[in-house]
Amino acid sequence: MKKNLKIFKLIFLIIFFLLIFFKILTKKKIGVICLNHGQNIGNCLIDYAMFTKLKELGYDPYMIGTNYKQREINFLKKYTKCRIIKNNFSEIKEKEYDYLMVNSDQTWRKFSKRYFYDIGFLKFAKNWNIHKFVYGASLGYSKWKLTKKDEIIAKDLLKNFTGISVREIGAVNSVSKHFGIKPIFVLDPTLLNIFNL
């Protein structure tokens, strides 16, 4: 009887460790493209909230951004896994991640001509064979301000996305009208978690 119990415990431990090992091997890496435009701690909070939620769901997220200030870098390095892009998004390679995701915030507001299409619409990954998502994109204003040229380029880039969502009800109608895509309305990432203060 004791021998059978020892064998049972040994089998249980082997199965348990195999399951843990398999889960580690199958954990999906997500490259999360983040908007960073100067001294904005709000961006860091959104990035941290998304990182926390993705970890909770069993993913292996990496926060990817440009134009970070040193205090933002310190915050993100302390609480997340982050990657700072120095020159341009071509530093990211197709096989590095299983998924790419545009994080929430005003990612569809044209702050930067240099990075607008890469941050908001993953232009650098246009021809990649990878799942691409937009979570909780914001236009940053109530009236549509993108040019016809921006609409054409963005609409073409969004064709290759697996999922598109926005965080403003008004953006649902604007995106439907101008891009011909019906996005899902979602919460801001900071509202997805319960934090103990």
Residue locations for each model-derived region?
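Hydrophobic alpha-helical positions that pack around
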Residues: 189-191, 195-197
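Short, well-ordered alpha-helical microsegments
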Residues: 46, 172-173, 194
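Short, structured coil segments at secondary-structure junctions
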Residues: 128, 160, 179-182
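Aromatic- and Gly/Pro-rich donor/ligand-binding loops
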Residues: 11-156, 190
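N-terminal Sec-pathway targeting helices
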Residues: 2-11
